[in-house]
Amino acid sequence: VCFPPNEACSEKNMIERIKNAPELFLVAVDKETGKIAGSLNGLATDEEVFRDEFFKDAYLNNSEGKNIMILGLSILPEYRRQGLARELVRQYALKEKKNNREKLILTCLDAKVPMYLDFGFTDHGISDSVWGGEVWHEMSLDIHKVC
């Protein structure tokens, strides 16, 4: 629903992520309807540079890793433009700060760069990622700067 087919991970990969790193999922639920409004997920690693293999291999998760590779921030269309994405990122960063993580690292398309900059991320330029045949920016957020 939130990602076009060329950018979406397979159902199998998502199930593997849930099995291997359930603690790295954060889900927003509409209190009135009980409907899932959005989610954020990632894998922990000591690596500093995003690579496409993180999308495909949940076994790359290192529960002691100092960084989190964000693999998906998804907000259903009817919940967008209400600050939910910002709040999910903030809550996720605060949670991972307590786990002694250092950075959230992600890739995003050009159109999303301003949003992530507004959230406090730094744009490191074009990523080596070729996921979905797209051109991606690599961005990071120093978790210790989040309050």
PLM feature segments, named:
Residues 4-32, 39-50, 54-60:
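Active-site rim helix/loop that mediates acceptor-substrate recognition in acyltransferases
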Residues 24, 102, 122:
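Short acidic/polar active-site loop segments enriched in Thr and Asp
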Residues 35-74, 80, 130-135:
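Conserved acyl-donor/pantetheine-binding loop and adjacent beta-alpha core of acyl/acetyltransferases
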Residues 75, 81-94:
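Conserved acetyl-CoA-binding loop-helix of GNAT-fold acetyltransferases
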Residues 89, 95-109:
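Conserved GNAT acetyl-CoA-binding A-motif
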Residues 102, 109-110, 125-147:
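C-terminal "cap" of GNAT-fold acetyltransferases
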Residues 117-127:
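Conserved acetyl-CoA-binding loop of GNAT-fold acetyltransferases
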